[in-house]
Regions:
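Short, compositionally biased P/S/T/A/G/V-rich stretches that sit at domain boundaries
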Residues: 1-11
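Ser/Thr-rich low-complexity repeats and stalk/linker segments
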Residues: 35-87
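Short beta-strand element of the alpha/beta-hydrolase
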Residues: 150-159
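Conserved alpha/beta-hydrolase
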Residues: 174-189
């Protein structure tokens, strides 16, 4: 009897890239429970779905709806987006976690004990992307640049927590955009709270971006979630050098 197998089209991929997971050589018609476990930043996450193998003993996760699990409809990435946080102790993330691929362990177990598994690596920072600290001209943040000329540039704003959410800039640069993760409070040298933030500081950031030789006359956008989304809308309505807003 052939041992059950698990395969995937991309073992290493960007965090937002779809992958196709296939299970083969399970007993035909058998139910197969698939578990995907990962540690992301400081928490452990897990998703689970049960499928029925077809007459050839195959399960195509991208094309089959699970019989049960943490998601219910056909979804190629269901085992990723439906993951639930496990009640484990907090794990200390790597110091440079944005630069560090994280692993997702996929395990499939048939009702009669057949097993297969694989490990995937997910990346926030694509090949050739560079990251540099910006602490000049009154600005604090991270600048992410893609290899080659950028398609456009984005000023990335954090939300009400005041953190510099590097992963957004890393992902944008991995898709060809220059991204400046701009801090505007709760960082050294900046206001402690989200009060009385002068708009002039954002004008300074926009002018700084426009001076960069790689930007030229390319589009400059601003993006932010949560309270950062409110700020992005305000900046787009205030400064004509902002060409696009996502909030």
């Amino acid at each position: 009897m052939t041992a059950a197998r698990a395969s995937v089209d991309h073992r290493v991929a960007l965090a937002d890239q779809d992958v196709q997971i296939e299970l083969t050589d399970f007993p035909p018609g058998e139910t197969v429970t698939v578990t995907a476990t990962q540690v992301f930043r400081s928490s452990r996450w897990q998703a689970q779905a049960t499928f029925r193998a077809d007459a050839a003993g195959r399960v195509s996760i991208a094309r089959q709806a699970p019989l049960s699990g943490t998601y219910t409809d056909v979804s190629p990435m269901g085992l990723f987006w439906s993951a639930e946080r496990l009640p484990d102790p907090i794990v200390r993330p790597p110091d440079d976690w944005v630069l560090t691929p994280w692993q997702i362990r996929v395990e499939a177990i048939g009702q009669d004990g057949a097993r297969a598994g694989l490990v995937l690596a997910r990346l926030l920072l694509g090949p050739g992307v560079t990251r540099q600290v910006v602490r000049s001209d009154g600005l604090v943040g991270w600048l992410f640049l893609p290899p080659g000329e950028p398609k456009a540039a984005v000023i990335v704003l954090g939300g009400g927590g005041g953190a510099i959410d590097e992963y957004w800039g890393a992902m944008l640069a991995s898709h060809g955009y220059a991204a400046f993760n701009l801090a505007y409070f709760n960082q050294p040298g900046l206001p402690r709270g989200l009060v009385n933030i002068p708009l002039e500081s954002f004008d300074n950031a926009i002018r700084w971006m426009r001076r960069q030789p790689w930007l030229g006359d390319r589009l400059l956008a601003v993006w932010g979630p949560s309270r950062g989304g409110e700020l992005a809308l305000l900046l787009g309505a205030t400064f004509p050098d902002i060409n696009a807003v996502a909030a």
